[in-house]
Amino acid sequence: AALYFVGYITTIWLYSHRIRTLFLWGSLLSAFLAVSPIAALFLYYRHVEPLILGFAGFLFLLLLALVQIKDLHNLRGDISAGFKTIPIVLGESKTRMILRLIFSCLSLISIALPLVFDLGLMAYYFWASLPFFVFLAIDLWINRSSLSYIKMRMLLKIWVLLGTLSILFLDFERLNQLKALIFTP
């Protein structure tokens, strides 16, 4: 576990000093670093739970969309700073198409997770995610202003917060089963 965290901290340093300016790697690594502490749990307890992997995949795509919207909003600043972000290299229209693809994947995951796993009341968060991501995809199609990017970023940040809070509504029986499975030697 110590080696994992040494690698994690080193990767954060590399990201902040070198990688964040690179095409594609900066965006992917930013989202991955936010989700990778979940991998520490798998490493420590030596058990991989498909439900948690599903949550991590959902969060990764959500954060990747957040990074892309931030890059769209900061396009002029990133150009003057010499960054090679996805919107700079591929252009605004292709980045918006990639975002619509990410929102489509998030919509599919929002449908799949409650159907595959018993989430209890947390399933309502994922059911509500479907119209939310459809709304964002349509808004992305219609609006191209800096203000719309700011609005989307705020909505996505609120959605991440709501997702985190919705964990409280996960089926407690299921949580106890996971706890027993993970914490038994």
Residues of each region from the PLM?
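Multi-pass alpha-helical membrane architecture of UbiA-family
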Residues: A1-P185
